[in-house]
Structure formats: C-alpha cells, structure tokens
Amino acid sequence: MTKRLSILITALLLVSTVSTVLTKAQAADWPTWRGTDRTDISTEKGLLQSWPEGGPKQLWTFKNAGKGYSSFAIANGTLYTLGTRDGKEILIALDAETGKDKGAVVVGDILSNNWGDGPRGTPTVAGGIVYAMGGGGSLIAADSQTGVVKWKVNMSDFGGKKPGWGY
C-alpha cells in the first residue's frame, strides 16, 4: 500500500509540474495532446478563415514514421511524434518548419494487437524535456535539444498491467 501511495504521489507531482510548465509555453507551441490548455483551441492569429480552392499549399511531408496512432507536440520549432522503426517504438523529432528529421530515440518494443500496431500516445514537452509513452507501457524522458534519454521506466515496474489496447 505504501509503495502504491508513493507512486501515486510521484505521478501527481509530475503531472502538476508538467501542467505548470505548459502554461508558460510559447504562443506557437502545441506541447501536448490537444494543446497547451488541452482545449484544442489555438491562440494563433492570422489563420485561414476559409480553405482556398484545392486546399492550402503543402509545405512538407514526412514518410518515415512507421506505424502508430500518435498525434503531435510542437515546442521551440521542433515537432515530436511517436512511430515505429526496426521493430521498436520511437520518439521522432522533426524541424517544424522544414520537416527535416532531427533524430529519433527508442521508447520500447512495438505493441502488436488486434487494434493495430504501434504507439497510441502523444509526446508532451515541458521544461526542456520530452515525455513519451509507448503502447507497451515504456515511458521515457528525453532532453528536447539533444535527444539524450534522461530516464526510462515501464509501467510494469510499478505493478501496471498493460490494457488490451495498450497504453
């Protein structure tokens, strides 16, 4: 019971810290799923009020993300998402302006099940750290500038049991 309470308190402190840092994000940043306030509302100005014929001009595309269901987080000019390569789930960093691949780090093994393979979560960026959880429960914290993994845990380390659809 004490161990579970300790884990819960640690998790609550992490969420509290991340939430505090997110409120100080740059206006153009979208550092977590659904945006800074998790409302899906952008504070950007000068956005298109209607789509031009044929849609807006495509600026870039990226085709090396592999499988998965991750959305995107954007902070300090870098777009982060999760995908798969070489049998592993990975955290991918791209230049948000050009789409240039800035690198990737392994999060964990690929989650495979009847709902589709790959990660389900969206990275969160706070305080210079990118937090990413793979479908199998691996959670990493990586430096947002260098990609160096600061720490890595798995939910099973804390008694977590993988849901049928994954984390």
Feature names for model-found ranges:
Residues 1-12, 16-22:
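Bacterial N-terminal signal peptides that target proteins for export
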Residues 22-167:
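Noncatalytic, solvent-exposed loop/strand surfaces
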